[in-house]
Amino acid sequence: MRQIKLIIEYDGTNYSGWQVQPNGITIQQLIEASLATMLGEPVKLHSSGRTDAGVHALGMVAAFKTGKLLPLRAFSDGLNALLPNDIAIRDAVEAPLSFNPRADAKSKHYRYTIYNAVRRSPLARLSSWHLRGALDIERMQAAASHFVGEHDFAAFRASNCAAKTTVRRLFSVSVAKDGESVIIDVHGSGFLKNMVRIIAGTLAEVGQGKKNPDAVPGLLVSGDRAASGITAPPQGLCLVEVFY
């Protein structure tokens, strides 16, 4: 028996998220089906986490066990031949049988992209949130600094979040301008449901002048979801990398 670790890139536009569910096609479902076709046996993928419908990934990590003695290249090449063109296996490596993609993850890097221009971009529409009014980047950067460290992020989670604790540690939160895009990079030890999207929505409201940068500490202390920013739409979010 061996365990194969996959690094997966996907465009989440056409899927009901990562995790297998009764209604809707998911990325996990398609990869498991492709593996079953390749190996002639049912396969269960275990992942580093999950992404919601419409969210993308450059570096989702998942692993599965198999007794097949195929070369590693055969797993990536074989899957890429079977999967649709909006899902790709970037790499396949052998991992210890004890490897747990979720429990062993030390941190994750997410990126949220805002397309900040008067006119919408057809090419950017599936990978960014279009906001017309000019955003104040310096105000957003000032607000972003308050998220760094260990905090209770109860005010920055979805109402249906089932996490046992809402305390999380963020190592860095940055905001940068790249042409007509505003890039928000968030690196942390763990995340609550919709946490990055609510942080992005809050920073956008700061950039629009709707919130003060110094309001963030109070929002964190309050634990009040209604007081924080809107949940930014899913298409702007991408899981960039999982660190072990």
Curated annotation (Swiss-Prot):
Reaction equations catalysed: uridine(38/39/40) in tRNA = pseudouridine(38/39/40) in tRNA
Species for this entry: Geotalea uraniireducens (strain Rf4) (Geobacter uraniireducens)
Residues bound to substrate: 110
Assigned protein family: Belongs to the tRNA pseudouridine synthase TruA family.
Keywords: Isomerase, tRNA processing
Complexes and interactors: Homodimer.
Record protein name field: tRNA pseudouridine synthase A
NCBIfam families: hisT_truA (TIGR00071)
GO molecular function, one term: RNA binding
InterPro entries cross-referenced by the UniProt entry: PsdUridine_synth_cat_dom_sf (IPR020103), PsdUridine_synth_TruA (IPR001406), PsdUridine_synth_TruA_a/b_dom (IPR020097), PsdUridine_synth_TruA_C (IPR020095), TruA/RsuA/RluB/E/F_N (IPR020094)
Positions of the catalytic residues: 52 (nucleophile)
Function: Formation of pseudouridine at positions 38, 39 and 40 in the anticodon stem and loop of transfer RNAs.
Disulfide bonds: none
GO biological process: tRNA pseudouridine synthesis
E.C. numbers: 5.4.99.12
Keyword Repeat on entry: no
Key word Isomerase present: yes
Gene3D superfamilies per the UniProt record, alphabetical: Pseudouridine synthase I, catalytic domain, C-terminal subdomain, Pseudouridine synthase I, catalytic domain, N-terminal subdomain
